[in-house]
Amino acid sequence: EIRQVAADFGRAVDTAYEAGFDCVEVHAGHGYLISQFLSPYTNRRRDEYGGSLPNRMRFLRMCLDEVMETAARRNMAVLVKHNMEDGFKGGIEIPESLEIARAIETYGVDGIVLSSGFVSKAPMAVMRGIIPLYTMSYYMQWWLRIFVRLFGRYMIKQYPFEECFFLENAKKFRAELKLPLVYVGGLVSREGIERALDSGFELVQMARALVNDPAFVDKLREGDRSTRSACDHRNYCIARMYSLDMQCCKHCPDLPRKIREELAKLP
């Protein structure tokens, strides 16, 4: 089954190519499948896929071998999203993460996207900001909704938002790696983007700022260093992901009353 899943990663590249894409990003972070093999917190296997770091990296290498072979045939670029740290004790920390990143560099990928966090253990470490628990539970299935409303505040650690919140850790990887690196994390202004680029990162990624305003990149191009996103990081858009219809709260005038009340109370 493991070999089949790795082969499926290669087939996914074909699907992306046929859909018209020029680049794929292999998600090896945030506690998803590849990340679960890499992290000592989730990987308790006692075979060739668990234990030592080289063993825990084996599945990643298998997936990338398939992806790189197909991408080369399709003339597509390949990025890897990589956790600098999982965000909790017992998970991947920076020294081990640097070892993984150095190995990824030798695989011939076109760049690494540096992130952090673990969706099942430290979800807000990924994005930072406020946790609208009622809103989040509103879009979940009924059984999960009850659980989140009762226990969410005790289980989900909060991480205050600050601009460029991953930058200092990301610089440690920039100092050790030669391949192109993509910075992501808390980019909401032209000044912040310039700070990341001036720190040696070839590219940047944004998400919530573009959910708030799809034309934000054009405004950055036309504006000055003070140009800034109107996103206030109340994370309604993140909570709404469970509905498979991500939208910014500022563009939803018909929000249910309790959601409006919760968002209004958030600082």
Predicted segment positions?
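Flavin-dependent oxidoreductase catalytic cores
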Residues: E1-P267
